[in-house]
């Protein structure tokens, strides 16, 4: 039996800065959730008093329907699904370094995405397509939700989590290296994008967003997912693409530990 040598046992990678990152992300998430949901009201746009036949107001007269993808399911997709993959990979390889950076990176991406999305939502104050039906309910919380259409939070959050997961899979399958990938690897790596695209499109089907809302949200989530992934993992085009970064020893891949890390982070070539 070949003994797997974990990189975690070879060198130190965890620093005080990682703890600071965790607490900062948690603090930012809590503060922005309170501020933009309970303290800061959305920008109040002009509402025609009587002439609801204007082109602008005709666009917000769609029926009020339940979410096709409720918030709990969105969180399960954007955060739960990647975590299942990270945990499964940890169980297989026993690499704490990789698991920590994957979990931290996902939380960082989620926090930054929520911050950007909520700031833009209250700043734009755009009416949802079902705003008229929300006003008819007379419920203040429902009406308020009708004024935060741009950008789509479902789109930004789903693309954030799925982009991070897709890049994680690309790194582990080494799909961009010189020897190339295959159709199965490509499908595995691209599957998260299809999931996030379906979540985004569902927001137009239930009349909670326009296409411009979901497009903006998708760009935000995708951009932040890519940005944060490369904060924590190496380039997908390098030989170290499957490895997490190391703040204590940035050049650990050149210091004789790379073979041990590769052995710890190996993935089946049968994909």
UniProtKB/Swiss-Prot annotation:
Its main location: membrane. One of its GO terms (cellular component) is membrane. It is a multi-pass membrane protein. It comes from the Eukaryota. The keyword S-adenosyl-L-methionine does not apply. One of its GO terms (biological process) is phospholipid metabolic process. It is found in: Membrane. GO terms for molecular function: phosphatidate phosphatase activity. Keywords: Hydrolase, Membrane, Transmembrane, Transmembrane helix. The chain crosses the membrane at residues 23-43, 68-88, 102-122, 150-170, 181-201, 211-231. InterPro entries: P_Acid_Pase_2/haloperoxi_sf (IPR036938), P_Acid_Pase_2/haloperoxidase (IPR000326), PA_PP_rel (IPR043216). Disulfide bonds: none annotated. Belongs to the PA-phosphatase related phosphoesterase family. This is PA-phosphatase related-family protein DDB_G0284367. It comes from Dictyostelium discoideum.
């Amino acid at each position: 039996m070949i003994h797997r040598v974990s990189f975690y046992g070879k060198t130190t990678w965890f620093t005080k800065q990682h703890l600071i990152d965790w607490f900062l992300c948690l603090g930012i998430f809590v503060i922005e959730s309170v501020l933009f949901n309970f303290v800061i009201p959305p920008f109040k746009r002009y509402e025609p008093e009587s002439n609801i036949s204007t082109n602008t107001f005709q666009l917000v007269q769609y029926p009020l329907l339940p979410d096709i993808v409720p918030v709990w399911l969105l969180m399960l997709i954007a955060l739960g699904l990647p975590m299942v993959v990270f945990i499964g990979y940890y169980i297989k390889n026993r690499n704490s370094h990789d698991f920590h950076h994957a979990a931290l990176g996902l939380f960082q991406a989620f926090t930054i995405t929520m911050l950007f999305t909520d700031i833009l939502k209250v700043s734009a104050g755009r009416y949802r397509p079902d705003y008229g039906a929300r006003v008819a309910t007379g419920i203040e919380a429902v009406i308020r939700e009708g004024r935060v259409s741009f950008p789509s939070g479902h789109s930004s959050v789903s693309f954030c989590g799925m982009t991070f997961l897709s890049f994680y899979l690309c790194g582990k399958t080494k799909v961009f290296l010189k020897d190339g990938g295959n159709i199965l690897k490509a499908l595995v790596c691209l599957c998260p994008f299809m999931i996030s695209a379906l979540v985004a499109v569902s927001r137009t089907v239930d009349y909670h967003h326009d296409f411009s809302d979901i497009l903006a949200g998708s760009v935000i989530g995708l951009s932040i997912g890519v940005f944060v992934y490369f904060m924590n993992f190496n380039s997908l085009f390098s030989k170290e693409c499957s490895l997490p970064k190391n703040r204590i020893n940035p050049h650990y891949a050149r210091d004789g530990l790379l073979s041990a890390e590769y052995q710890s982070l190996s993935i089946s070539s049968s994909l």
